[in-house]
């Protein structure tokens, strides 16, 4: 029986694992392959991309961070801008749950696009009742 596929929002945690070829990178790669084939849509909020950029810059240097963002822009991932609707949703999430503000943007994006969040960040356990989580 074929598993039904869901659209996904890639959280910074999952993308960083992919960038650094850590545990869970293969799952992210498989989702990107599914997105390339048109089986699913993959999203990332631009706030989370900014988070990825500064973390990658700190850990691996500016050159690597820039190269990774350049490479990431070629992947089948739709960037989602922080529209007013998403900003308000993220702010409401932040007011109610002890999540980082950037994580709230991932949740707001998943709610807007009715998508599953792909992450390994245990902080998301606090909102499992609101959105589906694909743990990597």
Locations of regions flagged by a protein language model:
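Alpha-helix capping/helix-boundary segments
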Residues: 14-15, 48, 86, 106, ...
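Anion (oxyanion) recognition and catalysis
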Residues: 36, 73, 111
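Helix-loop "lid/cap" segments that line or gate small-molecule binding pockets
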Residues: 55-56, 76
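Acidic, PIN/NYN-like endoribonuclease modules and their adjacent C-terminal/linker elements
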Residues: 1-7, 107-136
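Acidic active-site catalytic centers that drive phospho-/nucleotidyl reactions
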Residues: 11, 51, 103, 121
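Active-site neighborhoods of divalent-metal-dependent phosphate/nucleic-acid chemistry enzymes
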Residues: 78-118
């Amino acid at each position: 029986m074929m598993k039904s596929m869901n659209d996904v929002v890639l959280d910074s945690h999952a993308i960083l694992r992919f960038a650094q070829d850590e545990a869970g990178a293969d799952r992210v790669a498989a989702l990107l392959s599914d997105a390339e084939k048109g089986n699913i849509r993959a999203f990332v909020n631009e706030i989370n991309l900014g988070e990825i950029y500064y973390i990658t810059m700190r850990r691996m240097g500016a050159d690597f961070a820039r190269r990774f963002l350049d490479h990431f822009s070629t992947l089948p991932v739709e960037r989602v801008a922080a529209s007013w609707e998403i900003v308000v949703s993220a702010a409401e999430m932040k007011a109610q749950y002890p999540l980082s503000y950037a994580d709230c943007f991932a949740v707001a994006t998943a709610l807007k696009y009715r998508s599953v969040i792909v992450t390994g960040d245990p902080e998301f356990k606090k909102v499992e009742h609101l959105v589906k989580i694909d743990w990597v």
